[in-house]
Amino acid sequence: MSYIPYVVEKTARGERSYDIYSRLLKDRIIMLSGEVNDAVASSIVAQMLFLEAEDPEKDIYFYINSPGGVVTAGMAIYDTMNYIRPDVATICVGQAASMGAFLLSSGAKGKRYALPHARIMIHQPLGGAQGQATDIAIQAKEILRMKEELNAILAKNCSQSIKKVEKDTDRDNFMSAEESKEYGMIDEVLLKKSKE
């Protein structure tokens, strides 16, 4: 069981207690901490839709610390990021691996960041197949289709050729924050938060 801190906010009307994630949501901050799965994706999609309804013009800040996860769940988040009107700024804290890295690169151009000691890792989609030979063939065909789709999007996000992305994702490919900037995954390594 994970521990979720609570914060107490004092207002003219008295005190109010929030779990930390609800409090961050008030500031248009969404956290992805851990594996990308259907439950996590549903929560993140709902938060993005809520923030769009609150103010379609203000940016959303999407902090990512994830080892990756289920491709279809990640694509639900990706499609929502592109569907909603606000820009989604992405910030890697800790790690963005696999689908986490894909989502990091999918933030609004010019608004994709990583902290200095973050690790970013890209690779091809993982999958396993069992069952009858024809079912395994169907699953193999689908994972190859997904691989092509993900590589095409990643190539566009990073301004790289599809051939380069195919080569670079053939095996686990780890990058530092600075290397991921050179690759085009992010736009800037954040050293200190601005005092705006």
Curated annotation (Swiss-Prot):
<feature type="active site" description="Nucleophile">
    <location>
        <position position="98"/>
    </location>
</feature>
<dbReference type="Pfam" id="PF00574">
    <property type="entry name" value="CLP_protease"/>
</dbReference>
<comment type="function">
    <text>Cleaves peptides in various proteins in a process that requires ATP hydrolysis. Has a chymotrypsin-like activity. Plays a major role in the degradation of misfolded proteins.</text>
</comment>
<keyword id="KW-0378">Hydrolase</keyword>
<dbReference type="GO" id="GO:0051117">
    <property type="term" value="F:ATPase binding"/>
</dbReference>
<comment type="subunit">
    <text>Fourteen ClpP subunits assemble into 2 heptameric rings which stack back to back to give a disk-like structure with a central cavity, resembling the structure of eukaryotic proteasomes.</text>
</comment>
<keyword id="KW-0645">Protease</keyword>
<dbReference type="GO" id="GO:0005737">
    <property type="term" value="C:cytoplasm"/>
</dbReference>
<keyword id="KW-0720">Serine protease</keyword>
<keyword id="KW-0963">Cytoplasm</keyword>
<dbReference type="GO" id="GO:0006515">
    <property type="term" value="P:protein quality control for misfolded or incompletely synthesized proteins"/>
</dbReference>
<feature type="active site">
    <location>
        <position position="123"/>
    </location>
</feature>
<dbReference type="InterPro" id="IPR033135">
    <property type="entry name" value="ClpP_His_AS"/>
</dbReference>
<protein>
    <recommendedName>
        <fullName>ATP-dependent Clp protease proteolytic subunit</fullName>
        <ecNumber>3.4.21.92</ecNumber>
    </recommendedName>
</protein>
<dbReference type="GO" id="GO:0009368">
    <property type="term" value="C:endopeptidase Clp complex"/>
</dbReference>
<dbReference type="InterPro" id="IPR029045">
    <property type="entry name" value="ClpP/crotonase-like_dom_sf"/>
</dbReference>
<dbReference type="GO" id="GO:0004176">
    <property type="term" value="F:ATP-dependent peptidase activity"/>
</dbReference>
<dbReference type="GO" id="GO:0004252">
    <property type="term" value="F:serine-type endopeptidase activity"/>
</dbReference>
<dbReference type="InterPro" id="IPR023562">
    <property type="entry name" value="ClpP/TepA"/>
</dbReference>
<comment type="similarity">
    <text>Belongs to the peptidase S14 family.</text>
</comment>
<dbReference type="InterPro" id="IPR018215">
    <property type="entry name" value="ClpP_Ser_AS"/>
</dbReference>
<dbReference type="InterPro" id="IPR001907">
    <property type="entry name" value="ClpP"/>
</dbReference>
